[in-house]
Amino acid sequence: MADLLSDGELVFVGLNSHHALLAAAVAKILHRKRIRVVTVAEGYEPSLADLPVRRSTGDPELARIGTVLPTVEAFDLAQKGKVDVMFLGPAQVDGETNINVSVIGSLESPKVRLPGGAAAAFIFPLVRKAVLWNFRHSVRSLVRRVDFVTATARNASNDVLLCTDLCLMRYDRERKAWRLASIHPWSSKEEVLGSTGFEVIADAGFVVTRAPTEEERELIARLDPDGLRL
């Protein structure tokens, strides 16, 4: 996911987004990208090189080692179009960019209650680039229709990407469908399509995802000694 970040971007990392925080660290520390990071713990530009990943990326330590930026201010930045990237980790994603972090099953009688979307419905369509991540790629998480629409970018014009443990997809607004952008080295087109509950455009345009370097692996292992990313 670090490769999806670019110079000059303001990046918002949400709650329990360990993968997103590590991606930002790799992009900033190793790739030398001039990104600015805002966390849900109200930390602005925390020193990522000095911070081991905790069980919650809402850890106030993130604010202590950086400037405090109240969450309401981050929302104002999104409203003004100044948040370039937001990472979101939904339990379900469907073929229209609808995401679900609310309930599995019906709202009236849910099988599972999820953490909720906070301001996802507000921010998701406003950021210039939304990076969704779900590292349990299956027909249960990438579904034909989410059980509950917590947020959507269906009627927006922003760039929306979906990173899983099998591939990277980008939403094609002209075709109104997800397009396969890259397949991870350990996966295949057949596995991706067979594990996805919605239509995926899988023409000849996709590539093989770059494997992480040894230096990247070492940094990730140092920042996440407890393996919370796994």
Describe the function of each predicted region.
Residues 39, 123, 218-222:
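Alpha-helix boundary/capping detector
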Residues 1-64:
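N-terminal active-site beta-alpha-beta segment that forms phosphate/nucleotide-binding
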Residues 51-212:
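Conserved phosphate- and dinucleotide-binding cores of soluble alpha/beta proteins
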Residues 1-21, 25, 158-176, 199-230:
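Intrinsically disordered, low-complexity segments enriched in small residues
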